[in-house]
Amino acid sequence: MAGPEPNPFYPLPHCTMPSRLFHRLAVTLFFIAASALGISARAQFGPKPANPGGSTVTTPHVQAELVAHAPQGVGPGQPLWLGLQITHQPDWHTYWKNPGDSGLPTELTWQLPAGLDAGDIAWPVPHKIAIGTLANYGYEGTVLLPVPVTVAQTFAPGPLAKDVTVQLKASWLVCRKECIPEEGHFTLQLPIQSTTALHSAAFDAAQKAQPQPLAKASVQQQAQVDGDALQVRVAGLPAALRGKTLDLFPEMPEVLHNAAPGTQQWEGDVWTARIPLAEQRSNSPSTLPVVLAERVQGSTPRPGYRADLTVQGPWPAVAAKASVSPALEAALKANAALAGSWLPPAAPSGASSLTLTAALLGALLGGL
């Protein structure tokens, strides 16, 4: 397999901007790349696919597959799960619902038959991924993003129907030191009367990776704004966690300083922590949902626990909107100039190259 094309552009930092600003850039890049240059991923044929596309998309950075779990077939009241299973190449990662300091969460858009209703992604516990002075939340290795599907009592595929067709458009940002927006179109046919359980082990593991809810917020499950930090108290965690160091993942972005170590300790069965607020904070919630999990090395799966923290005390004023640093602005302008005299070769199926991303960033610079 041929190696990556050499990059003639000035190197750009790994998403070194607040996620609010990055979101604007990345979404714009995504649509420019997908519509103008035709570099979206092509679906490869999986088991019993239906046009247009198959159940698997492969890029140089990930393999993404639309999978299903319907142990009793597809019918009213029967359990039905769909999911996108992403297998990352080594050192590459995609993002959680709150991507952290930079990045974008994976997005799923479903096209389902009448009577089937897809819920939200049941996000597994993420891992903290350090990139220089930043901290992101996401996944490496293989992860399944499961989605519960409700089958209505009115579901009526017809007396001669044997299968239902599920279609999915997914978009994800995959990063190493560089970030590449990718998308895929997936199609899968599910038998109505027969069992679909080929990926039952993966769905069982994904179920165990879901954060378990703690008791409703109380005086022992709260957060207190204290100057430029948040004092957190959480009771009701399993006894097996007592005395151990925990990771806290806020579900809401741009509230806490993701890369700051903070301080934490146990007071009997109550876990307490002091976590600095984000320098570019843009949210001031009265309730902050968080996920807690034991701190481990690498991407080892571990159970997580979800709490809705009642936030007390006045929030400081939110930070002014961030601007692009002079160094990044200079690099973007230089890359835009180079892009005018260099046309990249066709990218591999499914991937937009960093050189293309740099050129588009330069073109967008005037709109920041």
Labelled PLM ranges:
Residues A2-E5:
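Acidic, Ala/Val/Gly-enriched low-complexity intrinsically disordered segments
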Residues F9-L29:
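Bacterial N-terminal signal peptides that target proteins for export
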Residues A26-G38:
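Bacterial N-terminal signal peptides
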Residues I32, P71, A135, L356, ...:
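N-terminal hydrophobic or amphipathic segments with adjacent small-residue motifs
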Residues A41-S352:
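Extracellular/lumen-exposed scaffold segments
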Residues A346-L368:
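Core alpha-helical transmembrane segments of integral membrane proteins
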